[in-house]
Regions:
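Short active-site oxyanion
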Residues: 19-22, 79-80
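Alpha/beta enzyme core
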Residues: 6-12, 16, 28-53, 61-75, ...
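N-terminal basic/disordered segments at the start of proteins
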Residues: 2-4, 22-28
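C-terminal alpha-helical cap/extension of soluble enzyme domains
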Residues: 217-278
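Catalytic-site beta-strand/loop segments enriched in glycine and acidic/polar residues
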Residues: 23, 177, 202-206, 210
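Cofactor-binding active-site loop characterized by glycine-rich and histidine/acidic residues
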Residues: 58
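Glycine-rich beta-to-alpha transition loops that act as phosphate-gripper elements at the mouths
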Residues: 25, 81-87, 207-218
Length: 278
């Protein structure tokens, strides 16, 4: 197999009534582990780099993007590369040269009209440069280390009528929706509003994306896919597996034993969560 456009993986999943898992990576070990997990279950996967991950790497996108691309090229399953939660126009414009075929542009923190205007501009640029683009409408909390709001509070979730208009007016290729999940959850105790998901799936013609999926048990993930979610974003679950393994295998000097354990733990987590979607 090899590196393939992430948007194509989502489109194929949507046509088959399935979902593709998209894992946020921070280190080379993340990328290697996710691909190992996908190979175990024989399913495609997406590697995602967020703007925050790029900031962690001193603002340099190319080194980690090229490493992820090299891992994807050597994979035994189709692997997409996606630039996630982009707010900076400067970073958005680096996507093509860095080898990304898709981006998620995040203006969801803005009021509706401003979100629409910013997203439409980003979508116009993305399409002119051959990129598939995802956007977000609603409040999927827990970003940037912030305490997540009540995901079921009035106004936090995505309105189906607004979603229909937003997609039509912005021209995006996929929409991340707020239906009860939150970013950065370390326990799998969240629950989704499946009635709202059904209304969104009926209202919106593009694939729907679920963010904050680490906090959902397997049954909720499976129900989300059955209800119309076509891309499932996962990040914190990998980090919980990684840091737990590092603590258990920490050595005085040589990093290889604990990084080996961390990679193995993340691969096991990735395989299990990919399988839960199938």
């Amino acid at each position: 197999m090899s590196l393939v456009p992430a948007g194509a993986l989502v489109t194929e999943a949507a046509a088959a009534g399935r979902a593709v898992a998209a894992f946020n990576i921070i280190t080379l070990e993340h990328a290697e582990a996710v691909i190992e997990g996908a190979e175990r279950v024989g399913l495609p996967v997406i590697l995602q780099l967020s703007e925050n991950a790029v900031k962690f790497r001193s603002g340099r996108l190319l080194p980690i993007a090229r490493a992820a691309s090299a891992c994807a090229e050597a994979a035994g399953v189709p692997v997409g590369l996606h630039l996630d939660h982009v707010k900076s126009s400067e970073l958005l414009r680096q996507a093509v040269d860095a080898g990304f075929g898709s981006v998620m542009y995040d203006a969801a923190h803005l009021p509706y009209a401003e979100n629409l205007e910013a997203t439409r501009s980003a979508a116009d640029w993305a399409h002119a440069n051959g990129l598939w683009i995802e956007a977000e409408l609603g409040e999927v909390g827990g970003k940037d280390g912030a305490a997540p709001p009540d995901p079921h509070a009035p106004g936090a979730r995505t309105d189906p009528d607004e979603a229909r208009r937003f997609v039509a007016d912005s021209g995006v290729d996929a929409l991340a929706v707020a239906i009860g999940s939150s970013h950065a959850m370390t326990s799998r105790t969240a629950s989704l509003d499946h009635g709202l998901l059904a209304r969104l799936a009926k209202a919106v013609e593009v694939p729907l994306v679920l963010h904050g999926s680490s906090g959902l048990p397997d049954a909720e993930l499976a129900a989300a896919v059955a209800g119309g979610i076509r891309k499932v974003n996962i990040g914190t679950a990998l980090n919980v597996a990684m840091t737990g393994a590092i603590r258990a295998h920490l050595t005085p000097a040589d990093p290889r034993p604990y990084l080996t354990a961390a990679r193995a733990a993340m691969a096991t987590t990735a395989a299990a969560m990919i399988a839960a979607l199938d």
